[in-house]
């Protein structure tokens, strides 16, 4: 009977061992599944964070580019207005100088003869030359009119 008891006990031990082995395998599988899910969640979180960071960087870059564009437009407009103002004042000053010189020359012409008349004409010519030079400098003349006075090297 001893052999029968030993055989019975050996079977029981084998059954318990198999049961514990199956429990351990089940626990390991559960832990592996939990680790897998946790890793997937961490990867998804990292992906989402990276996407958010990239989107924020893109928006910041667009805002910076727009601000630079706006600033450039403002600066360009201010420069254009300043140039127009300067050109207008130069036209007025040149015109005033020309008119004053013209009047002075006319007065000298009317009031004197000979040498004084020639001097007045020369002054008038010089004033006109100065006026033309100012106009030429600011690009307010037709190139055809000034070919005799201001030769250019443009080809």
From Swiss-Prot:
Gene induction: Up-regulated in response to water stress.
Region (2 X 11 AA approximate tandem repeats of T-A-Q-A-A-K-E-K-T-Q-Q): 53-74
InterPro entries the UniProt entry points to: LEA1/2/D7/KIN2
Record has Repeat as a keyword: yes
Signal sequence annotation: none
Taxonomic superkingdom: Eukaryota
Region of interest (Disordered), residue spans: 1-155
Composition bias type Basic and acidic residues, residue spans: 11-21, 28-39, 79-95, 144-155
Stretches forming Sequence repeats: 53-63, 64-74
Transmembrane segments: none
Comp. bias intervals (Polar residues): 97-120
Keyword entries, A-Z: Repeat
Tissues expressed in: Highest expression is found in seeds. No expression detected in adult tissues.
Residue ranges with Low complexity bias: 40-78
The keyword Repeat is annotated on this UniProt entry: yes
PANTHER family: LATE EMBRYOGENESIS ABUNDANT PROTEIN (LEA) FAMILY PROTEIN (PTHR34191:SF20)
Record-stated family: Belongs to the LEA type 4 family.
UniProt protein name: Late embryogenesis abundant protein 2
Organism field: Cicer arietinum
Lineage: Eukaryota, Viridiplantae, Streptophyta, Embryophyta, Tracheophyta
